[in-house]
């Protein structure tokens, strides 16, 4: 736990350059005066984070904007964004770096900020549980505000009933910064736990380059909301279930028999 301490006014640990691997460390309670404290502040180089826990930090991991930096997050847990503040604390916030891979990790109990937000050039979000859960009130569950290449495969992405924002996955809200803008969603389960209709995936076509590619394949949506009807692109094999068809609170994502 940080216990009010930080490195360089930024984080519990600051990774400035080089090739690093961090394993089996728990990062808690990171705060700094500007509201952007982090468990890890990753600035440049290559970093792999494996089997770590990030809890009650202003940001779990926060990166800088060096376009040659690469971040991999494997089998880690991000939870419990701080409350009692007007700041937007993201559990994982990735800046304009070369690449991001997040695999086998869990994100839950956000508050006003996002569970995972990335401005990276290339993104691979694979086989994770982004489930805001009871007591969570994150904004977006997953956002790529500046586009880029984003592969989102095999995740369970679940929005809390207490979320103030209907969008579950967002792409390109601030336009397309990168030369390649491509969103592929496949084999994901997207859940709305509230009674307000969700926007399961929103891509801002008017703000993105005309050659932007959006493809969805074999995704399952659960609960009220719009998916491909409000999403331009190529869509195949997606299926919708009504509210209550799954039991996210019990981590039961088996669909009913038909």
Language model features with spans:
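Glycine- and acidic/polar-rich repeat regions and solenoidal domains
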Residues: 2-16, 23-257
């Amino acid at each position: 736990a940080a216990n009010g301490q930080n490195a360089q006014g930024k984080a519990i640990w600051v990774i400035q350059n080089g090739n690093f691997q961090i394993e089996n460390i728990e990062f808690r309670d990171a705060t700094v005066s500007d509201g952007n404290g982090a468990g890890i502040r990753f600035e440049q180089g290559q970093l792999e984070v494996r089997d770590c826990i990030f809890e009650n930090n202003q940001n779990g991991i926060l990166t800088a904007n060096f376009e040659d930096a690469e971040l991999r997050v494997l089998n880690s847990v991000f939870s419990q964004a701080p409350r009692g503040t007007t700041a937007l604390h993201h559990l994982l916030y990735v800046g304009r770096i070369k690449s991001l891979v997040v695999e086998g990790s869990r994100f839950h109990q956000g508050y006003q900020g996002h569970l995972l937000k990335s401005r990276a050039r290339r993104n691979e979000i694979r086989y994770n549980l982004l489930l805001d859960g009871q007591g969570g009130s994150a904004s977006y569950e997953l956002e790529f505000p500046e586009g880029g290449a984003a592969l989102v495969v095999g995740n369970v992405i679940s929005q809390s009933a207490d979320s103030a924002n209907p969008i579950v996955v967002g792409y390109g809200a601030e336009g397309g910064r990168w030369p390649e803008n491509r969103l592929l969603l496949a084999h994901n389960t997207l859940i709305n736990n509230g009674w307000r209709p969700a926007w399961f995936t929103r891509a801002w076509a008017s703000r993105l380059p005309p050659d932007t590619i959006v493809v969805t394949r074999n995704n399952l949506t659960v609960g009220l909301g719009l998916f491909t009807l409000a999403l331009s692109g190529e869509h195949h094999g997606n299926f919708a279930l009504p509210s209550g068809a799954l039991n996210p609170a019990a981590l039961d994502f088996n669909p009913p028999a038909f």
